[in-house]
């Protein structure tokens, strides 16, 4: 399981983060690049996705009666309004990433002649700049 909680839209060695494990978890908590106020999503293959959907929707199985469950399940669904908020933001993700990248460039420029060093992307990485960090060498 890959923890991609904060890396939506980032790349490592040319691959999307969230694509390295059999399953990855992305957070939509209130402070993330995309938010639904909580919850998140998993990234996986179709078979694993169907299994996860079954378990997270109370393990109901199709049946003429309303409440037939074939195993213990959970109610981990987002309310529809939260899901709609997330979908609308996902449609804007490229623009959000571009704005975050531009802002990081401004921080880098503003800090270049100060005692602070902007922590930039390592080689082979493309950050979503969800958070930005600096190092204050004179204070280490």
What is each PLM-predicted segment?
Residues 7, 13-21, 123:
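Active-site-adjacent capping/gating segments
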Residues 1-14, 46:
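Catalytic PLP-binding core of fold-type I/II PLP enzymes
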Residues 4, 29-30, 86-89:
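A secondary-structure boundary/capping signal
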Residues 1-3, 27, 135:
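A cross-family glycoside hydrolase active-site/sugar-binding cleft signature
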Residues 8, 17, 34, 74, ...:
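Short clusters of hydrophobic/aromatic residues that line enzyme substrate/ligand-binding pockets
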Residues 19-57, 80:
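Active-site PLP attachment segment
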Residues 11, 47-140:
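PLP-dependent aminotransferase class I/II
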Residues 1, 25, 117-119:
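Structural detector of well-ordered beta-strand residues that form the stable sheet scaffold
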